[in-house]
């Protein structure tokens, strides 16, 4: 979450007249994240998250994102729900941008997740994959391999400013991933961004998943590989085998991986690391000065990518092989 667009109290009050949420009491911007402008609202009816969609979010994708939240909630997945307007729509407009009001989910994200947290995340991800199996809408992954290439074309010219030799290294990585990327593994709806700040806990128990604005249809094991990258590396970018084993075991307790998925896990983890390195690099070079947003270091994911290059089998991630 982040803030790119400032809004006035008058604008917000007028916007809220179209929702059954009472009167505005207070609001404040949320700085974490990189994609949309987000505000925490308190009204006489409760707490809500207001999201203004910008940057990489296409308005035509909003029915997928918001509909997915409704679908998952009906299937028992704990996640926020979009608030219906008085005209029964889900999408309004504020400050010239599409906007939606979302229910507030109780909990806190874990700054220092343990293996116990990772096990719960693995299970929750598998639950999400199964719950979304009959979701009728489709959305291709705009940040799959073709999307990585477009990002790279926008950042390559200045890449060596961030890390000497980065352009050559990433070009070599593209050559391998574009040649070997799997296309026939089990696929379905994936979250695609299940980082620690998108998972809430209460009293040590997972209380819900948030931020579905990268959700799409893609390889299920790629979603799991993204979680390995997001949850199982320490601050010094060393891989925590105990966390990895817990995350993978939690996932497989609900949805066992196929032999082919297990074999491809190192390559999928490389692709995931490249994807997040590229979006961080692009944002590092292009986010406007003065935006209330935290830039994230692309080199953290370059170091993950280098780790995955050395992995020969998925057993090195902590998965139990039959």
Swiss-Prot record:
InterPro entries: Aminoglycoside_PTrfase (IPR002575), Homoserine_kinase_II (IPR005280), Kinase-like_dom_sf (IPR011009), Pseudomonas-type_ThrB (IPR050249). Gene3D superfamilies: 3.90.1200.10, Phosphorylase Kinase, domain 1. Pathway: Amino-acid biosynthesis; L-threonine biosynthesis; L-threonine from L-aspartate: step 4/5. GO terms for biological process: threonine biosynthetic process. Its EC number is 2.7.1.39. It is an enzyme of class 2 (transferase). It holds the Pfam family APH. One of its GO terms (molecular function) is homoserine kinase activity. It catalyses: L-homoserine + ATP = O-phospho-L-homoserine + ADP + H(+). It comes from the Bacteria. The keyword ATP-binding applies. The keyword S-adenosyl-L-methionine does not apply. Keywords: Amino-acid biosynthesis, ATP-binding, Kinase, Nucleotide-binding, Threonine biosynthesis, Transferase. Belongs to the pseudomonas-type ThrB family. HAMAP family: Homoser_kinase_2. PANTHER family: AMINOGLYCOSIDE PHOSPHOTRANSFERASE DOMAIN-CONTAINING PROTEIN, AMINOGLYCOSIDE PHOSPHOTRANSFERASE DOMAIN-CONTAINING PROTEIN-RELATED. This is Homoserine kinase. It comes from Chelativorans sp. (strain BNC1). The gene is thrB.
